Amino acid sequence: MSIRIIPQDELGSSEKRTADMIPPLLFPRLKNVYNRRAERLRELAENNPLGDYLRFAALIAHAQEVVLYDHPLEMDLTARIKEANDQGKPPLDIHVLPRDKHWQKLLHSLIAELKPEMSGPALAVIENLEKASEQELEQMASALFASDFASVSSDKAPFIWAALSLYWAQMASLIPGKARAEYGEARQYCPVCGSMPVSSMVQISTTQGLRYLHCNLCETEWHVVRVKCSNCEQSRDLHYWSLENEQAAVKAESCGDCGTYLKILYQEKDPKVEAVADDLASLVLDARMEQEGFARSSINPFLFPGEGE
């Protein structure tokens, strides 16, 4: 089952009521996304072998919060949503939507915010990005969107992605439409931008017990039923792995049919779990899944494959 985004004026009253029952999409609410992520990363850094890198990621998340408010985005996406709906495409499709210079402005603002906090190799990386031409930055962005990770060094990718993600999240939060679930394929990709998830989460509150995949780019969440592979939609050979016990808040859901896995986080086990932070902090579980022969079906925005990986 795929999810299409229907323009507000094309939704009948019955569709509006149905959409309110089980929301197929949760558009990003940017008010506290980045601060909460930064706080969780810092918390998880304590007594974690990856503590230094988690604190580094927290600096980037905090910078995103600052830049978000320094550079708000105003854009009318009504026409874009209608066009994408007619074409059956995500409205902010990363492979189609032209990028304007706003994302590069965000990148340079992130660099300015981060430079006082960086030293050594990390400082050299952002200084190198600061000197890059607009064309070079666009080429790196296009390579990341095409999953051509060999063309962008893994130390530059998190900074480029942080700016792109902030830009796409700003756009996604402005979408003036509702979502309707329709039968189809490709539920493994974000219905808003076409990127992949970072992890999935079984939620509490108004969406109690429902699983949502969290986009690694635009921060949108979309509903996928539980006990079904989020990558191939099969359900006959699923297994759940953890490094702790059955009550663990972070598990990996593996599929024997397609040979992939995705992290699944449980808010009922730990209300503070965060899609990006807890995924990054549990890389030991990723190593275990690789040993078991499973490939990751997602990418964390702070950890990109390097050349040859």
Swiss-Prot record:
SUPFAM superfamilies in the record: FdhE-like
Signal peptide: none
The UniProt record lists the keyword Cytoplasm: yes
An example Gene Ontology CC term for this record: cytosol
Keywords noted in UniProt: Cytoplasm
Compartments, record wording: Cytoplasm
GO biological process: protein maturation
Main location: cytoplasm
A GO MF label: ferric iron binding
Domain of life where this protein originates: Bacteria
Matching PANTHER family: PROTEIN FDHE
Protein family: Belongs to the FdhE family.
Protein name per the record: Protein FdhE
Source lineage: Bacteria, Pseudomonadati, Pseudomonadota, Gammaproteobacteria, Enterobacterales
